[in-house]
Amino acid sequence: KMTKSRQKGDKHQTIMGKRYYKNDIVDICIRDYLTLPKYLKDCLKGYKVGLEFEEKEVSLDPYALGYWLGDGDKTTFHITTIEKEVIEYFNKYAKENGLQLTRGKEGTKNEITYHITTGMIGGSNYNRNPFLNSLKKYNLIRNKHIPEQYKINSRQSRLKLLAGLIDSDGYYNRQSNAIEITQKVKPLAKDILFLVRSLGMRGTVKECEKSCMYKGEKK
């Protein structure tokens, strides 16, 4: 994609015999790009285009899955949050599926764990929870990843999935002007990278070390 001209007052650049203006899209192969002089290379910036897939039916709302992947219990459908909007969303979604959102224990950062249950006690009712059954269906119990049905789905579905991941496990880095998601599960990190790039966004992965202070000790 063309950026501002190198020479002051220039309104266009000629590339491979064609005239281009600022913000024009230049469709050029790598071989031809490498033959360009440096000043023309400096005028061109990478332009990413998202992938389009047909919509596929899934048994768990993409946002709900994204939120669980980011901050849910890997063994069942429990989530931890203090965000009012998130609590309202899951409460509404649970009711629409004949389930209940119940409040559990409070964490060290005033975060509260919420359980999505059938509201009935007994082992036989364990398998009546459609949320939990969906996790089993997509082989997600103790195996967090983005199922193929969600990775190769409509743009709207993938955006909702990414929104859930960001709301649960992401934050805005002002210094780099980017959204960062810290994820220790490597297969899931790779899936998130694919998701971001499939939507036409720039995504990178790098290793980092996270720590916190607890009772004067670094953990």
Q: Model-found features: residue ranges?
A:
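Intein-associated homing endonuclease modules of the LAGLIDADG/DOD-type, together
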Residues: 1-214
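Short, intrinsically disordered, charge-balanced linker/junction segments flanking boundaries
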Residues: 215-219
